[in-house]
Amino acid sequence: MIDIDKIKEKKTIKELLEFGIINIDKPSGPTSFEVSDFVRKILGLRKTSHFGTLDPKVTGVLPIALNRACKLTGFFLGEDKEYVGIMSLHEKVSQEELERIMKDFTGKIKQLPPVRSRVKRQEREREVKNFEILETDGKEILFRAEVQGGTYIRKLIHDLGEKLGVGAHMLELRRIRAGIFKEDNEKYPSISLYELEKVMKDEKMLRKIIIPGEIISQIYPVVQINEESAERILRGQPIYEKNLAEKYNFNVENKISVFSEDRFIGVFRIINEREVFAKPEFVLQPIS
């Protein structure tokens, strides 16, 4: 297990800003890109990127990658998301009927992206892991949904209304979790843009809110390599079995977080071909 707190203690603020993540609580109004760009400008960074688009009116957890951590974006995008929201039914139905139909939208479902989405409009399979009613007030329903990354909640509500035969649309939506990033995380709760502006010139406070990019080790299992092979592997060469600090057993195509002690090397993909254990997907060069 990699001790993220220990790694963070050793880093300078420059190193954290070069390879870190901030868990932003997105407000209603701006686009996800605008939020990301705002963070870039006020922190004086070269670039930023976000881990999964939220519509302008949607609020909540929007992790923002800083500088070199932007290369990690693709590794986080597919992680599960969790939302709370309010839907409006166009006609009243009993709670029993609503719960019954909601069960039809739990598990593997087929979804066609909305007309205004940026992806190609072709039917895709997604998994809804939990879809439940929290509270009802006439035709307005407070709900919670835990879904696979890439699931469109607005479309989920629309399709639910169609299946009910009365129609439905989403009134409000808030993302409360994006993979390992949560709004109420004990160490790294989401912070507002206003709070970020307040701490941006206070190094001690800024350090508190930046999550080291090494947090990727909580997504992909950790593999330790021998210290003497680290420099060669940092140059983009593959990992051979002889470079491993111990024996590992992973399926081919699995992704791994590679470390030499507590030094992050990168994200690699298992191939197990002719003594080659894994090939690089992302390598973190030393930060000078």
Show which residues each predicted segment covers.
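Short, flexible turn/loop "capping" segments at secondary-structure junctions
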Residues: 14-17, 77-80, 135-138
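Ser/Thr-glycine-rich phosphate-binding loops at phosphate-binding pockets of nucleotides
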Residues: 31, 147-155
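Residue-level signal for inorganic ion chemistry
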Residues: 64, 85, 156, 233, ...
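Accessory RNA 3′-end/elbow-binding domains used by RNA modification enzymes
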Residues: 1-54, 118-123, 129, 140, ...
